[in-house]
Amino acid sequence: GLWKSLLKNVGKAAGKAALNAVTDMVNQS
């Protein structure tokens, strides 16, 4: 239902943010 799709979207956003953070760290070193 609503909660499942909401959690899925939050998970996607968190995954993207984590990926971006890792990429930034790699680029900085």
From Swiss-Prot:
The keyword Protein biosynthesis does not apply. The keyword Metal-binding does not apply. It is found in: Secreted. One of its GO terms (cellular component) is extracellular region. Expressed by the skin glands. Keywords: Amphibian defense peptide, Antibiotic, Antimicrobial, Secreted. It holds the Pfam family DD_K. GO terms for biological process: defense response to bacterium. Belongs to the frog skin active peptide (FSAP) family. Dermaseptin subfamily. Has antimicrobial activity. This is Dermaseptin-J9.
